[in-house]
Regions:
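Thiamine diphosphate
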Residues: 1-300
Length: 300
């Protein structure tokens, strides 16, 4: 945000009393007040009101680009505002951080599980979960340029590595190949967000040709032509494994009837983020084991 704030002087917004945690404050931007000065809005601890205010600003005259931010878990509190934004085709932007069990010790009350599927179920909402800093740049680009509906960004709390082959521009296509074997792929790993790094590490350890697909936005991928979708996910490759730290609901659209999902079908746990992720199977070793078992089953 600091990098592009000078180029987006009409962008205003803030957080539901979590600006320091979500990192969504324009430094030096001042606080919006009765004099209408400042770009930072102090919404207070009231997520639904924040969403409604963001929608109202978006409705005003189209001159301002409003955003509201909180933890992803608290998107439940503002769901109706998000739905109205989608229904009304507003240019509202929602920035949700702390997007998985990887957030750590705050535990199940703060760890999103069903939220990816729930938010993807809202028609006309772009839900983007970038893998690293490069994809986050691309996600912001989509968010600032998209018309005809709201955009939601789901970002991690934990640090993630900058990956070698991620692309800012490719985010606009919803999904793309970040790793391909020398030979035709026999297994495809499909991941979103911080789990893309796990998929890439697993692919390095696989003894069969394995493709890795980053899928930051289902909705944008669905809007691509069938030729591109089949190029990314060849129909003849049935051994497809999704890797996402949430429920598997909806993933069979992409992994197919014979594919499998590494998912979380229960509430989280209070422990350091890496410990929770390892406990729930988000390790390269587990991905390799699941992928090889899937390939064997599909091939038999």
């Amino acid at each position: 945000m600091e990098a592009f704030k000078r180029y987006t002087p009409t962008m205003v917004g803030g957080a539901a009393d979590l600006a320091e945690s979500t990192k969504t404050e324009f430094k030096g931007g001042g606080v919006f007040s009765a004099t209408h000065a400042g770009r930072n809005i102090a919404f207070g601890i009231r997520e639904f009101a924040m969403g409604a205010i963001v929608n109202g600003i978006s409705l005003h005259d189209g001159m301002l680009k409003p955003y509201g931010s909180t933890f992803l878990i608290f998107s439940d509190y503002m769901r109706n505002a998000v739905r109205i934004a989608a229904l009304s085709e507003l240019q509202s932007l929602f920035v949700w951080t702390h997007d998985s069990v990887g957030l750590g010790e705050d535990g199940p009350t703060h760890q999103p599980i069903e939220h990816y599927a729930s938010l993807r179920a809202i028609p006309n909402l772009l839900f983007i979960r970038p893998a690293d800093g490069t994809e986050t740049v691309g996600a912001w680009k989509v968010a600032l340029q998209h018309e005809g509906g709201p955009v939601a960004l789901a970002l991690t709390r934990q640090k993630v590595p900058t990956l070698e082959r991620t692309s800012a521009d490719a985010v606009a296509r919803g999904a793309y190949v970040v790793h391909d074997p020398d030979d035709a792929p026999e297994v495809i790993l499909i991941a979103t967000g911080s789990e893309v790094a796990v998929a890439l590490e697993a692919a390095k350890r696989m003894d069969v040709p394995t493709r890795v697909v980053s899928m930051p936005c289902w909705e944008l991928f669905e809007r691509q032509g069938s030729d591109y979708r089949d190029e990314v996910l060849p129909p003849d490759v049935k051994a497809r494994l999704s890797i996402e730290a949430g429920v598997a609901l909806g993933w069979h659209k992409w992994v197919g009837d014979e594919g499998d999902c590494i998912s979380i079908e229960h509430f989280g746990a209070s422990a350091p983020g890496p410990t929770v992720l390892e406990k729930f199977g988000y390790t390269a070793d587990n991905v390799v084991a699941r992928a090889l078992a899937l390939r064997e089953r599909v091939s038999s």
